[in-house]
Regions:
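Cap/lid and interdomain-hinge subdomains that line or gate substrate/regulatory clefts
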Residues: 1-2, 20, 24-32, 41, ...
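Active-site beta-strand/loop microenvironment that shapes enzyme catalytic pockets
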Residues: 299-327
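A glycine- and small/hydrophobic-rich beta-loop-beta segment
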Residues: 228-300
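N-terminal short beta-loop-beta anion/metal-coordinating cradle
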Residues: 20-42, 255-266, 330-352
Length: 379
């Protein structure tokens, strides 16, 4: 199975699901996404199309699809579970490039209280446009009605069914899984498809819950850098200094010297936050993630931490691209969507040798942290 994800945390989430099921999984991102794709049961291609313009997202979708092997037997499009992104444009481009006759778009995640009922999207029984997703800087939720959010979807062959339970999802797969339909959506749909299409393909032992917990690289208060770069971010009380982005930078100033991060030099740990939500739009979003990424690079130039934790897909992509970190090995799934990856990167600071192994933990902004910050984590 090949998966194309529209942001890096979504890609990591899907890779983590496949990993936890014991599947051989490859995760590629950035410019490497169109290089030779490793022959694995599941290959996840991370893109940043959600943060691109619609025209750029269409071009990137065509580019990636054109590099897929003719032997690709199954393609899944990972989309956001909160209706964000250039969904119709990207699905249309993928159908044109691959020959799929129609698409089933199912962003519902019933396991997380995210359902579609009578054509409306709810999060824990609250219409999505009444949640914090209405503050998203690029794709603010203005309606909970899918046909209003994507008015041209059905005309382009994109089906948007209801789903209130995981059983509903399994029934939809049984109805549409004919080899002519491109499935697109969130993690619950992928998990169900994985079981249907590859349930008998793996012949080893799936990792147990306890082994996954033991793999958790917990949070040390002495060598950890945490980026809270999502409008869904919640405050963290970890005994680590917090450095909020100043209002001047948030409002458009690009002078990073205004951002006081002096505590990092003392204990080599820090939490960077964005405490404001009043700016929306593409320009604001690009500025905010760029500032977060540049400040992170500045800090890592001072000291390369053992653990980098990033909340928010756009922030994660911008940061890892700015750092030049593009190749990772998945080492643990802490909770749904909370995935840890290992990277061995060149180290140019005075505090480490020529290379250093860094654990990178990624999490979508709206997902819970699981037991990452639990006292039982291996620190």
């Amino acid at each position: 199975m090949i998966v194309i994800a529209d942001d890096i945390t979504g890609a990591a989430e899907i890779a983590g699901i496949a990993f936890s099921e014991g599947h051989q999984v490859s995760l590629v991102c950035g410019s490497s996404a169109c290089c030779d794709i490793v022959a694995a049961q599941t290959t996840v291609i991370a893109t940043d199309t959600r943060s691109m313009t619609e025209a750029e997202a269409i071009a990137e979708s065509h580019r990636i699809a054109s590099h897929l092997s003719p032997l690709t037997t199954y393609l899944f499009k990972k989309t956001d579970s909160a209706l964000r992104g250039h969904v119709v444009a990207e699905l249309t481009a993928l159908m044109e490039a691959t020959g799929y006759q129609r698409a089933v778009y199912l962003p519902a995640n019933p396991s997380k209280g995210r359902i579609i009922k009578n054509g409306r999207y709810y999060i824990n029984n609250v219409p999505i446009h009444e949640t914090d997703f209405s503050f998203d800087p690029e794709f603010p939720a203005k309606t909970s009605v899918l046909r209003e959010r994507f008015p041209d979807a059905e005309a382009k062959g994109i089906i948007m069914p209801d789903a209130e339970s995981e059983e509903n999802i399994r029934r939809l797969i049984a109805e549409y899984n004919d080899g002519k339909t491109l499935f697109a959506g969130a993690a619950d749909l992928f998990s169900a498809l994985l079981n249907v299409n590859h349930g008998d393909a793996y012949h080893g032992d799936r990792p147990s819950d306890s082994s996954l917990r033991l793999a958790n690289h917990g949070v040390s208060p002495h060598d950890t850098l945490i980026l809270c770069g999502s409008t869904q971010s919640k405050s963290l009380d970890l005994g680590i200094p917090i450095a909020p982005m100043p209002r001047e930078i948030y409002d458009g100033n690009d002078d990073l010297s205004l951002w006081d991060t002096s505590e990092y030099a003392k204990i080599h740990s820090l939490i960077l936050t964005m405490p404001f939500t009043h700016r929306t739009g593409k320009k604001a979003a690009v500025h905010l993630r760029s500032m977060m990424a540049q400040k992170t690079k500045e800090l890592i130039t001072q000291h390369q931490p053992s653990h980098l934790i990033i909340e928010g897909g756009a922030t994660a992509w911008a940061t890892l691209q700015t750092l030049g970190w593009t190749q990772f090995k998945i080492v643990a799934q802490i909770a749904p969507g909370v995935v840890q990856m290992s990277a061995t990167i060149a180290c140019h600071t005075s505090t480490c040798g020529s290379k250093k192994r860094v654990i990178v933990t990624l999490k979508p902004g709206s997902y819970p942290w699981g037991d990452l910050f639990s006292s039982s984590a291996d620190t």
